Regions:
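Alpha-to-beta junction loops
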Residues: 38-41, 55-65, 77-79, 110-113, ...
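Secondary-structure end/capping motifs
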Residues: 199-278
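N-terminal hydrophobic or amphipathic helices and topogenic motifs
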Residues: 1-41, 250-324
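Bilobed "Venus flytrap"/periplasmic-binding protein-like clamshell domains
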Residues: 6-30, 89-169, 182-187, 269
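Beta->alpha turn/N-cap motifs
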Residues: 44-48, 58-70, 75, 85-86, ...
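Solvent-exposed, polar/charged alpha-helical surfaces in well-ordered, non-transmembrane soluble domains
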Residues: 22, 31, 53, 57, ...
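Short beta-strand-to-loop elements that line the ligand-binding cleft
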Residues: 39-47, 61-62, 132-142, 175-178
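Pocket-lining segment of extracytoplasmic ligand-binding domains
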Residues: 68, 124, 140-235
Length: 324
């Protein structure tokens, strides 16, 4: 830690402060970043901010992104996925029952707000053969009140967030999840740039480990971290909102079953194939440099080291025998 000497870095969040980013607040509050030699700025996002651009341009060393990182990679933006927080993406469509929306196909002709960067929701429509141009697209206000007031019929949302206010308003609503169409994507992926990883591999490793340690703490102490968020980062919502968000996140993160941060090449392959199947990625898209899999690489390095040692001994034995 001392060798890193409190290096300043920025983590660009993908949205406003909330329990959605609890692990990073916990890592800061518990001193995990400090112990890793890092001084971390947690930068809140605003609507329309391109998180990938912030990271690739070097304005931020790290970011939180969607599965659209794969599409960014195809576009030539050299992003590297470091860890997955949500094993199941929280992105859904929420529709007013009063707007006569009974199935996903009823979105045709309805007033729909879809947020930027929600590629999997667009993929959901394509999978269901619903042309996006047949929706009455409305710019997203990011206010569930617009759905409550009937200004729109459908909104894209995080299943862990907006329903808090819809329930409080006693609104009858339906939730449509891409998982019903076989689109079971990751959510809120921690990432960096190839440039950052290439120049500062130890810093990347230290930041990742401290962040995931923070996430484990946050999921074990949700009340404490919800109170921290409300007191230090954002009082935009009542404390009960952050506690609600924490509860809703448990089945999406699955900390009881899966190590926080875990991601598999096979699952990313499935995501890439899903995008390819609907024309959002080319078939056979090579994303090998997109994944940061330190545990697997460590095992491969150990195997190679063992193989080299074995071969060296073998050669030495052959030389010895030949000299006899």
């Amino acid at each position: 830690a001392s060798s890193l000497a409190q290096t300043p870095v920025t983590l660009q969040l993908k949205w406003r402060h909330g329990f959605q980013f609890a692990g990073y607040y916990a890592a800061e509050a518990q001193g995990y970043y400090r112990d890793a030699g890092l001084s971390v700025r947690l930068a809140e996002a605003r609507p329309g901010l391109d998180v990938v651009r912030q990271v690739v341009s070097g304005k931020a060393e790290f970011g939180v992104g969607s599965n659209g990182l794969l599409i960014a990679r195809k576009e030539g933006r050299p992003v590297v996925a470091l860890a997955v927080i949500f094993q199941h993406s929280p992105l859904v469509y929420i529709a007013r029952r009063q707007s006569a929306v009974q199935s996903i196909h009823d979105l045709v002709g309805k007033r729909v707000m879809i947020e930027p960067g929600a590629e999997e929701l667009l993929a959901y429509l394509r999978m269901e053969r619903i042309p996006v141009d047949r929706l009455h697209r409305v710019e997203h206000s990011f206010s569930p009140q617009d759905l409550i007031d009937g200004k729109v019929d459908v909104i894209s949302a995080y299943s862990s967030n907006e329903s808090f206010y819809l329930d409080a308003a006693r609104l009858e609503y339906a939730v449509f999840t891409p998982r019903s169409a076989g689109i079971d994507f990751y959510g809120d992926n921690l990432f960096t740039s190839e440039d950052m990883l290439g120049k500062n591999p130890e810093q990347v490793r230290a930041f990742r480990e401290a962040s995931l340690r923070g996430w484990r703490y946050a999921m074990d102490h949700p009340e404490e971290i919800a109170a921290l968020i409300h007191a230090r980062y954002s009082s935009e919502h009542p404390l009960e909102f952050y506690l609600f968000e924490a509860r809703q996140m448990v089945p999406l993160i699955r900390p009881d079953l899966i190590e926080i941060g875990y991601m598999s090449a096979g699952r990313w392959q499935h995501i890439a194939e899903t995008y390819a199947g609907i024309g959002m990625l080319p078939p056979g898209f090579d994303f090998s440099r997109f994944l940061y899999l330190p545990a697997q690489r460590a095992r491969i390095d150990a195997d190679l080291k063992g193989l080299r040692t074995y071969l060296a001994c073998d050669v030495a034995l052959i030389v010895l025998v030949s000299m006899m």
